[in-house]
């Protein structure tokens, strides 16, 4: 994300067992500038959540369900607290079970829309991109539905951002790479909300 002082912060995971939780401070473009990394704790798919101007929340993946959320320090370069699990509830208020095809697997993302926090994620072997809504970054989040049906390339890693009043879904698909699953190509589609705040399902084109 880009802070008010013009710095650009990029968080990303690394290999299992090391080189994890990197950050870099950039002023112009994406030239490599040395950063540092945190504990070797097996985190992948790191991403900043909304409200970074007051408190930044990173949404890393734990080695197993569930995902975790943690508030960042004021300098946004380290964790300010212990990570907490992100709990996704069904419509009856019960946590999603491991056998549910819509449970969390990896690829955490969080964005904010009209005062609500949207936690979206990949379901792994069922290949859906799903989302849940909560009142704060810690949750709990209530499952809402599928954003994107399975694409070619196993899990769907994604991001949801707003640009000039329009929301967009970025994700990967392997069709442009002749269905070679480890050659993932970036795609983007416009994303729309219903009046009740739910997300309209995106059609992969």
Give residue spans per PLM region:
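Carbohydrate-active catalytic/glycan-binding domains of CAZyme proteins
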Residues: 1-205
């Amino acid at each position: 994300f880009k802070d008010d002082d013009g710095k650009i912060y990029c968080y990303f995971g690394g290999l299992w067992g090391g080189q994890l939780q990197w950050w870099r401070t950039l002023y112009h473009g994406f030239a490599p500038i040395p950063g540092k990394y945190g504990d070797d704790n097996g985190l992948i798919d790191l991403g900043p959540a909304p409200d970074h101007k007051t408190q930044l929340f990173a949404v890393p993946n734990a080695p197993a369900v569930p995902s975790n959320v943690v508030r960042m320090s004021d300098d946004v370069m380290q964790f300010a607290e212990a990570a907490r699990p992100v709990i996704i509830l069904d419509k009856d208020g019960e946590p999603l079970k491991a056998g549910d095809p819509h449970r969390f697997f990896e690829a955490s993302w969080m964005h904010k829309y009209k005062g609500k926090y949207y936690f979206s994620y990949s379901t792994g072997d069922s290949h859906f991109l799903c989302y849940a809504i909560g009142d704060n970054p810690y949750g709990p989040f209530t499952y809402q539905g599928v954003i994107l049906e399975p694409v070619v390339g196993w899990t769907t890693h994604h991001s949801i951002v707003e640009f000039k009043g329009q929301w967009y879904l970025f994700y990967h698909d392997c069709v442009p790479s002749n269905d070679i699953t480890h050659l993932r190509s970036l795609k983007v589609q416009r994303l729309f909300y219903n009046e009740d705040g739910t997300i309209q399902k995106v059609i992969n084109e």
